[in-house]
A protein has these predicted regions:
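Long, contiguous binding/interaction regions
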Residues: 2-6, 30, 55, 85-86
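Compact, glycine-rich, soluble single-domain proteins
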Residues: 17-67
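C-terminal structural segments of small proteins and small subunits
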Residues: 62-96
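SAM-dependent methyltransferases
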Residues: 1-15
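Generic structural detector for well-ordered beta-strands
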Residues: 15-17, 74
Length: 96
């Protein structure tokens, strides 16, 4: 790892289910990516064995997170636990 997230190898994971009626489409995905970039941690979405950067709108859209989709949020870095707590909560609260 490099950049501001380096120096702490704390790893956290959390299972999530997408509840938003329209899934994680462009608008909520952009908000999710913006918030993921705010942490001192690298955050990924793992779905069906594939890893997608949670900091990238394009990667989130590639994950095809429709309503009811299950995935794992994975974070590594100083803010790993806080990142997953807040991002999982965001997924619960997202409305179109």
């Amino acid at each position: 790892m490099k950049g501001p997230r380096a120096g702490d190898d704390t790893v956290a994971t959390r299972e999530v289910t997408i509840l938003n009626e329209l899934g994680l489409h462009a608008r909520p995905a952009a908000e999710f990516a913006r918030r993921a970039r705010a942490f001192r941690a690298d955050v990924w979405i793992v779905k069906e064995g594939q890893r997608f950067s949670a900091a990238s709108l394009i990667e989130i859209l590639r994950a095809n997170l429709d309503r009811g989709a299950r995935a794992v949020l994975e974070a590594r870095g100083r803010d790993a636990e806080a990142a997953l707590e807040r991002l999982a909560r965001l997924l619960q609260e997202l409305k179109d």
